Amino acid sequence: MSRIGKRLINIPSQVTVSIKDQVFSVKGPKGELSKQIPYGIQVVQQNDHLVVERVAESLLARKLHGLCRTLVSNLVQGVFQGFERRLEIQGVGYRAQMDGKKLVLNIGFSHPVVIEPPTEIQLQVENNTNIIIKGIDKELVGKLAAEIRAVRPPEPYKGKGIRYLGENVKRKVGKAGKK
């Protein structure tokens, strides 16, 4: 049995859950999400808990058991609390600002980089160097954070670029020079 898959998922009182034809739907104070559950996996509601079970003992079902449990847990947590990812910009003259719903990055290119988030995601900029990405879908929040970071990832010599808050960038020593 999967160690992750056999753990129970608590359902907060403000969250309603429905399971119909292998589609798991959850509704909470922050919004509504649904996910297709693969064949061989079943989600069962027991009082105020959810249990993810394997219907079939196939290799695929055993592989997907823990994954489905984590995805269902993320859906429940997303509609109840939401998810947040923070990025920081380091570098002289590097800054970010909001233009309506769009994020405008001035990060050393000859032109500003404009990023338009999906409708489910909210972006905020704190003091021109910190970007906050909020949403109810953990996958979308992480994907957008990775896309923003990929515009100018931190370089190893000076550490300039966009990084996750608290990310440790391995630094390299520059060349030794003439003697």
Swiss-Prot record:
Keywords: Cyanelle, Plastid, Ribonucleoprotein, Ribosomal protein, RNA-binding, rRNA-binding
Recorded GO CC terms: cyanelle; cytosolic large ribosomal subunit
Signal sequence bounds: none
Molecular function, one GO term: rRNA binding
rRNA-binding among keywords: yes
Pfam annotation, one family: Ribosomal_L6
Record has Hydrolase as a keyword: no
Subcellular location: Plastid, Cyanelle
A biological process from GO: cytoplasmic translation
Family note: Belongs to the universal ribosomal protein uL6 family.
Role noted for this protein: Binds 23S rRNA.
Complex and partners: Part of the 50S ribosomal subunit.
PANTHER family membership: 60S/50S RIBOSOMAL PROTEIN L6/L9 (PTHR11655), LARGE RIBOSOMAL SUBUNIT PROTEIN UL6M (PTHR11655:SF14)
Name assigned to this protein: Large ribosomal subunit protein uL6c
Organism: Cyanophora paradoxa
Gene: rpl6
